[in-house]
Amino acid sequence: MQYSKRYIISLSFLLNLSFGQNVILPGFFGEDLFNYIQNNYQASSTLGYNNARDVMYSEIDLKPGNQLTGVYSGYSITLDLSQDPSTNAYDQGINCEHTWPQSLGAGSEPMKSDMHHLFPTKSNVNSSRGNDPFADIPDINTDKWYKDDYYIETIPNSDIDEYAEKWNPPNQDDERFEPREQQKGDTARAMFYFYTIYENQAAPGFWELQEEQLIDWHFYDLPDQSEINRSNSIASYQGNNNPYVIDPSLVGRIFLIEEGTILGDMNGDNSLDVLDLIVSISYIIGQSNLDYNDILISDANYDLDLDILDIVILVNSILQ
C-alpha cells in the first residue's frame, strides 16, 4: 500500500516531538532494561562520607537564605556557612539519612557516600526510621507523627500530609515508616536507584517488603524540577544521574513489564498490528478500561499516559 510523502513526514514530525524528554533505551522492558541501567549508571566516583555530607548540606540541598530542610518532617535550620557544614547541621538537629539503611547494604563505600540516596533529616526522625521498610501506615496504627521539630501521638487535626509517621507494633520486625507526602516519590526513586545500582550489596528480602508501595509512591509523586536539579547537581560530583529521576518511565518499564515485551502489543501475540491499535483506541475514547501495565505497554512517547499521540507513533511503527 502506498502512503503519501506528506503523511509520512507528518508522522515523523510528531514522533520527534514526542521524544523531547529524556527516554532511556526506548522499547526495552524488564530485566534487559534493569541490567542496562545497572551497567551504565554507576557513579564514576564518590566523595567519601564526610565530604559528601558537607557538599550535600552546603550546596546540593541548601535553599535561599541558607535554609537546610529535613526531608521527612520539614524541620529547617539556617546553616552557618562559616562553619563546618556537617558539624553546624548536627548541632542544630540535622543529620544524614541513608534512604537504603547502612545496616542493610549501605554501610561501606561507595554505597555509604552515594548522594543519590542520602538526604538531610531531623536527627530524631532519622533515628525513628532506623532501618524500617517504607509503607503507607493506616492513621489509626500510627504511634508518632513528626512535623518540624516536634511529634504528637494522636492523629493531627490539620496539615496531616505534612507529617511523617512511625508505627511501632509489638513485633519489631513489623515496624514501618512513612515520609511526609511531598517526599514519597523522591524516597521511592532513591530506593529504586540503590536497589538497581547496588543489587549485589542490598540485603536480601528488604526490597520485596516495599517494592509495590514504592512503585505506587513513584507514580503518585513524579519528579519535579527541584528533584531533577538535585540529580543533576549530584551528577556534577559523582558522574552519574539517578536514571529514575531523569526518565520516570523506567519504573513501569522495569518493574511492571516483562523483558521482551513489544511496545504496543496489547493482545500479547508478540506483534504490533491493527488489532492492538483497536484496543488502545477503545480505551482512549472511553469504550473500555485497561490496567496500568497495559497503558504502559502502549505508552509510546513514555509520558506515563495513553493518548492519541501514542497511537500516531504506533501507526508509524506499523507503517515502517
Regions found by a protein language model. Give the residues of each.
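Bacterial N-terminal signal peptides that target proteins for export
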Residues: 1-9
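Bacterial N-terminal signal peptides
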Residues: 9-18
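Low-complexity, Pro/Thr/Ser/Gly/Ala-rich linker/spacer regions in secreted
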Residues: 19-24, 252-265, 320
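N-terminal module-boundary/linker segments of secreted carbohydrate-active enzymes
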Residues: 21-77, 254
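Sec/Tat-exported extracytoplasmic proteins
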Residues: 41, 45, 60, 75, ...
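Short, His- and charge-rich active-site/binding loops that engage polyanionic ligands
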Residues: 75-93
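Domain-level detector of nuclease and nuclease-like folds
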Residues: 87-95, 99-259
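Cellulosome-associated attachment modules in secreted, modular CAZymes
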Residues: 259-320
